[in-house]
A protein has these predicted regions:
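NAD(P)+-binding Rossmann beta1-loop-alpha1 motif at the extreme N-terminus of oxidoreductases
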Residues: 309-366, 389
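Amphipathic alpha-helical segments at domain termini/boundaries
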Residues: 9-32, 37, 131, 172, ...
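Glycine-rich beta-to-alpha active-site loop
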Residues: 70, 101, 106-153, 157, ...
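Short glycine-/small-residue-rich Rossmann-like dinucleotide-binding loops
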Residues: 119, 407-408
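Hydrophobic, secondary-structure "cap" segments at the distal end of domains
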Residues: 161-172
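Glycine- (often His-adjacent) and acidic-residue-rich active-site loop
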Residues: 69-103, 122, 152-155
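Conserved N-terminal Rossmann-fold NAD(P) cofactor-binding segment
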Residues: 352-401
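Conserved CoA-thioester-binding segment of acyl-CoA-metabolizing enzymes
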Residues: 6-68, 103-106
Length: 408
């Protein structure tokens, strides 16, 4: 891990992870970046994780561990996205990710019980730490959300996420969460099987410690999740090929083959089913570096960072926007238009009339789904539909106060 960490390292000290030995040989492992309001996955944290956790796994005096966070509303909120924008060497990315992934695999397969006490957001690489634990206790704090949103940045979960999430919630729900970047709150996570127990924020660590002691003493066995019938049927070769074929077809219909990330997620999940978890874990690692430097990922990372930066602009200095223009009716343009229609009239430009028509149809279909889920009313659907227009003439966007280029 050393070469990759040195490439991006911002610190000379290791102070983001604190360890404390408790009774009965349980070690409290606390994530707490002193320089940030939230914990994020950085190269410095990853190297510290290796140097502090591996010795604990090898120490005979240590009987178990409880992972927690000192932050009031964050466990680990995924990666530091700014570092994604700086990454320019796919091999270094794979090296760093691979070292982290293999430590999590070793942790998950170890004989020492590891329990996660999740209070606040556990996203991306943060959730992958949680998934490597043997028992998960989550708080019902409003900020407690769990998810693998990597696809929204053009990449894939690459520290075991494509294997361990479906292992907990099943193939169908796991694929849905990863292919959409969907986040779930604690109570829904419990219903899905993503977490084992939900309690109040003030009790989450003590409950996790209690469960660690139960596991050590044999009063509680590590949860075994029997696959539902549909999952077992999907495991049959003929059914499996049909199932993953349909998943790929659905992904291609949504992305028009413009985004490689979702297909890589499907590939890794399928490989795990067909040839085992170990091969799939190595496939994850091999994909993360090349994906991170694709034009698609670069654009999505830029969009994320720009959006975050815009949130810091004082409202009084903001210019009033009455109409949004979007250049490009592809998947990205359609997505931006769908979000913008909630507040503004939108004009989408494309040289292809078919692309414009398809864009409008997909937006309408998305709005209809929102009506069915009661996210919006039928009246809101009609209002947003009327705000949408498409054109092949660039001059038709002259009245737009904001123009976004979304063409590939």
């Amino acid at each position: 891990m050393g070469t990759a960490v040195n490439h991006w390292s911002k610190k000379n000290t290791m102070d983001e992870i604190k360890t404390e030995i408790l009774d009965r040989g349980v070690v409290k492992v606390t994530f707490d970046d002193p320089e940030r309001s939230v914990n994020t996955m950085t190269p410095d944290l990853l190297t510290e994780f290796e140097k502090k956790i591996v010795p604990l796994m090898e120490d005979e005096a240590v009987k178990g561990m409880v992972f927690c966070s000192a932050k009031p509303d964050t466990f680990v909120a995924g990666a530091d996205i700014k570092l994604f924008a700086e990454a320019d060497d796919p091999d270094l990315v794979c090296e760093l990710d691979g070292a982290y992934s293999r430590i999590l695999t070793r942790l998950s397969r170890g004989d020492k019980p590891v329990v996660a006490a999740v209070n606040g957001a556990a996203l991306g690489g943060g959730l992958e730490v949680v998934l490597a634990c043997h028992y998960i206790v989550a708080s019902d704090h409003p900020a407690t959300v769990l998810g693998l949103p990597e696809v929204q940045l053009g990449i894939l979960p690459a520290a075991g996420g494509t294997q361990r999430l479906p292992g907990r919630v099943g193939l169908i729900k796991g694929l849905d969460m990863m292919l959409t970047g969907k986040r779930v709150r604690a109570k829904k996570a419990f219903r899905l099987g993503l977490v084992d127990e939900v309690t109040s924020p003030g009790a989450v660590f003590e409950k996790a410690l209690e469960r660690a002691e139960d596991l050590i003493e044999g009063r509680l066995v590590r949860p075994f999740r029997k696959k539902p019938l549909v999952e077992r049927v999907i495991g049959l070769p003929v059914v499996r090929d049909i199932f993953f074929g349909k998943v790929r077809k659905k992904v291609l219909a949504k992305t028009r083959n413009n985004y490689p990330g979702p297909l890589k997620i499907v590939e890794c999940v399928e490989l795990g089913v067909k040839e085992g978890m170990d091969k799939a874990l190595e496939r994850e690692i091999s994909h993360i570096g090349p994906l991170l430097v694709t034009p698609q990922s670069r654009s999505l990372v830029w969009l994320f960072l720009t959006t975050q930066e815009m949130k810091t602009i004082p409202l009084e200095s903001s210019r009033s926007v009455k109409q949004v223009g979007i250049v490009g009716a592809g998947a990205m343009g359609m997505g931006i238009a769908s979000v913008s229609l909630g507040s503004y009239p939108v004009v989408v430009h494309d040289i292809s009339g078919e692309a414009i028509q398809s864009c409008g149809e997909q937006i309408r279909a998305g709005l209809e789904k929102q009506v069915k889920s009661e996210a919006i009313t039928p009246e809101m659907l009609e209002e947003r539909r009327m705000r949408f227009s498409g054109t092949r003439e660039m001059g038709d966007m002259a009245e737009s106060d904001l123009v976004i280029e979304a063409s590939s």
